[in-house]
């Protein structure tokens, strides 16, 4: 959730990491050291990600760019099965555990789109992931 990313960003900054935010300009207001949301083209975005120490985010175009350049990172998944998106051994993922509905996006009839309809009505796949789980995985990536 947006609040979790804000807490995560603050924790990374406390540890001395520089947080650069990329993506669309309507994304959440996560605090960052350099805010490039809505300010880069594909070439500029690629340059920023290619030179990053690590990528942290969701299943998105920037995550795929990070994998293309073999940038280590952590990606957070909910309704999408990570095995359909992760191609780099350096990209780790975090998802809620023990939910029968994980990967529900792939069980929807065509045309399969990311819709706000959740089988549990509570988006457990996102809400059950804790900031501590996220931070633990990020620290593993940063230390490797």
Predicted regions and their residues:
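Nucleotide-sugar donor-binding patch of glycosyltransferase catalytic domains
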Residues: 35-36, 67-143
């Amino acid at each position: 959730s947006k609040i979790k990313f804000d807490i995560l960003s603050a924790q990374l900054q406390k540890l001395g990491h520089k947080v650069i935010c990329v993506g669309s300009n309507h994304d959440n207001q996560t605090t960052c050291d350099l805010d490039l949301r809505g300010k880069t083209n594909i070439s500029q975005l690629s340059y920023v990600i290619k030179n990053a120490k690590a990528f942290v985010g969701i299943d998105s175009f920037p995550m795929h760019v990070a994998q293309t350049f073999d940038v280590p990172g952590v990606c957070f998944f909910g309704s999408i099965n990570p095995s359909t998106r992760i191609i780099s051994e350096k990209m780790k993922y975090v998802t809620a555990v023990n939910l029968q509905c994980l990967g529900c996006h792939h069980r929807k009839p065509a045309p399969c789109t990311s819709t706000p309809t959740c089988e549990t009505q509570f988006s457990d796949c996102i809400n059950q992931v804790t900031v501590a789980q996220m931070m633990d995985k990020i620290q593993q990536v940063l230390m490797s």
